[in-house]
Amino acid sequence: MTDAKNVLVTELTGFANPMIARRLAAAGARVIGCDPSISEDGAHDGVEVVGWAKPADVVDRAASQFGGKLDAIIISSAMPAPRIRVEDLTEENLMPYFERLAAGSLLFAGAAVRTMRPNKSGRIVFGSSSGPIGGIPGFSAYASSRAAINGVVRTLALEVAGDGISVNAVAANFIQTETYYPRALLEDPVKGPKLLARVPMGRLGEAEEVAALVELLALGQSGFVSGQVIPISGAWC
């Protein structure tokens, strides 16, 4: 259980984020979400939301609704990752990954730090990928943007450690969500078995399992854990 912690969850409708928001709320946190598809303040599927804007504006408005104290932020951007050979990369099909998954995530982190520093406490949890760790041929655009976040976790953790802020990343892969591994793929009689054969545990992970790890890092007794990129991929990496 939590002591009424205030948590902002970005990109509320993507990947495992709906489950993350529900689990944090069930643990006693006050959760506010934001998403590119939501332009107005209000509510979405029972979760309080602020309309999408620049990261600094979103964080400031959420913090204001929290009464000035942001305890944790879950920065979990997600976008489809089609297979693109490296020789076919162009600025047009490469840069959107960096703008959304890397630059956008880091800007949210910076805005959160500005809010958390005066309180000398806070937790930043990035939603990232273990793809850059294990390596998947044909996904260099996606992997490079995720690797940027994985690579900055340690640096950012050292930068804010003295202010009582922890920084970690949940590096997921082989999680059954409609964003990356939709149920239709799993149920395909040819592609499904091939997919599961790549996972040492022989199954896909569930959004609830990602949410459980996020809860531990955002709300649990894990405040001394920082600077870590934690794979959740069924022993794939």
Describe the predicted segments one by one:
Residues 215, 226-237:
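Short C-terminal tail/terminal secondary-structure segment
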Residues 79, 97, 123-148, 153-162, ...:
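Catalytic loop of short-chain dehydrogenase/reductase
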Residues 109-110, 154:
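A short, exposed helix-loop element centered on a Lys and neighboring polar residues
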Residues 161, 166, 225-227:
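Short, small/polar-rich loop/turn modules that mediate ligand/substrate recognition or access, typified
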Residues 87-107, 121, 125, 149, ...:
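Catalytic Tyr-X3-Lys loop
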Residues 162, 174-198:
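A glycine/serine/threonine-rich, flexible loop-to-helix segment
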Residues 50-53, 78-95, 138-141, 181, ...:
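Conserved mid-core segment of classical short-chain dehydrogenase/reductases
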Residues 2-32:
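Canonical Rossmann dinucleotide-binding motif of NAD(H)/NADP(H)-dependent dehydrogenases/reductases
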